[in-house]
């Protein structure tokens, strides 16, 4: 009986141990699952927080970039004005490109100071510089921006016009003269408006009396003097007009019949005058045909009447077909500005009053108005 009790107790103890072991395994499992879930939840929260922080950083950077661009655009004109008028550039938090041409707007601003980056980024090969105020800066002269063109600036000038900047080469101050037979330094100096000592110093000549044929000398440039156009002096012009008027006086108050037909016609008076100048009369069925029926290339020049035209003594005046019953009229000018206003002229006429065919109207003076359709013929010769 005692033994049976002990076996039963032993069996119960084993069963209780198994139950406790199972409970422990379940507890450990639940605890492991809980810890795992906790760790997983923490990592997920951390990843989500990191994503939020990164998103905030990206948004903040985007906002800063947009703000910087808007601030750059807002200050764009102000910056240009400062570059042009003050010669100094004050940049914002972002990079700014400076055009060298806009920085040097005129000669007065070349020696002004400008602050630029000590190590500019993304600098182009042209005249543009990138200025960044996040890096150390130093002051330099704008003139240093053109250091690459220093050799060219010795011979070229920069000029500003409406279309921008352009350069032109300065005219040389000296030219080469080759010594010829019979030349002397004094004669050369006189020719080029300089002194003997100046030529000596320029060409390192010790003895001014010793130069050689074919020797090359530097002499000053002299401007080209264009010959003045030949003009007829007022005295010569007045003399020629006087001789013409004197001849025309001999024709006045007389009747002239050059071709022996129809009495004393206007055409007859003009033919007498032209025959005196060139030895022949003029062609034409009527007076209005004179400018077109004759070749005046070597004898005269033809003028059409204009508001500023002034006839000269000795000119032939040809009236259109509105006069003379359709045949026109012609006369010889005595005074091209009879009224002082270029509205009237005086001429020597024949048959103006239709009395020539009866030989009742001699050559006489008549004052006419300038008409739009008048033609004037000016002979090269003077009577």
Curated annotation (Swiss-Prot):
Cited InterPro entries: CHAP_dom (IPR007921), LysM_dom (IPR018392), LysM_dom_sf (IPR036779), Papain-like_cys_pep_sf (IPR038765), YSIRK_signal_dom (IPR005877)
Entries under Pfam families matching the protein: CHAP (PF05257), LysM (PF01476)
Function: Probably involved in peptidoglycan hydrolysis.
Signal sequence segment: 1-49
GO cellular component: extracellular region
Enzyme class: hydrolase
Keywords assigned: Cell wall biogenesis/degradation, Hydrolase, Secreted, Signal
Descriptive protein name: Probable cell wall hydrolase LytN
């Amino acid at each position: 009986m005692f033994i049976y009790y002990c076996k039963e107790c032993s069996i119960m103890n084993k069963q209780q141990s198994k139950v406790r072991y199972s409970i422990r395994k379940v507890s450990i499992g639940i605890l492991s699952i809980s810890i795992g879930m906790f760790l997983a939840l923490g990592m997920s929260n951390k990843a989500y927080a990191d994503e939020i922080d990164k998103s905030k950083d990206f948004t903040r950077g985007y906002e800063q970039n947009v703000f910087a661009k808007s601030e750059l655009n807002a200050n764009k004109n102000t910056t240009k004005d400062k570059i042009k008028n003050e010669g100094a550039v004050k940049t914002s938090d972002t990079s700014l490109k400076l055009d060298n041409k806009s920085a040097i707007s005129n000669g007065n601003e070349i020696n002004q100071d400008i602050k630029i980056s000590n190590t500019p980024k993304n600098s182009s090969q042209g005249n543009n510089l990138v200025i960044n105020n996040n890096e150390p800066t130093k002051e330099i002269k704008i003139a240093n921006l053109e250091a690459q063109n220093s050799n060219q600036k010795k011979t070229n000038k920069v000029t500003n016009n409406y279309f921008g900047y352009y350069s032109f080469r300065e005219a040389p101050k000296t030219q080469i003269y080759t010594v010829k037979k019979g030349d002397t330094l004094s004669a050369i100096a006189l020719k080029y408006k300089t002194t003997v000592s100046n030529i000596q110093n320029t060409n390192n000549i010790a003895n001014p009396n010793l130069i050689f044929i074919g020797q090359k000398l530097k002499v000053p440039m002299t401007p080209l003097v264009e010959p003045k156009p030949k003009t007829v002096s007022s005295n010569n012009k007045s003399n020629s007009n006087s001789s013409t008027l004197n001849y025309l006086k001999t024709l006045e108050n007389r009747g002239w019949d050059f071709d022996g037909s129809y009495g004393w016609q206007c055409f007859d008076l003009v033919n007498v005058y032209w025959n005196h100048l060139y030895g022949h009369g003029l062609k034409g069925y009527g007076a209005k045909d004179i400018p077109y029926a004759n070749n005046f290339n070597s004898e005269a020049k033809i003028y059409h009447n204009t508001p500023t035209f002034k006839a000269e003594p000795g000119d032939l005046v040809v009236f259109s077909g509105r006069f003379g019953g359709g045949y026109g009229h012609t006369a010889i000018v005595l005074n091209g500005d009879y009224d002082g206003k270029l509205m009237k002229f005086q001429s020597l006429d024949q048959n103006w009053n239709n009395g020539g065919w009866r030989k009742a109207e001699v050559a006489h003076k008549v004052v006419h108005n300038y008409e739009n359709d008048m033609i004037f013929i000016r002979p090269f010769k003077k009577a």
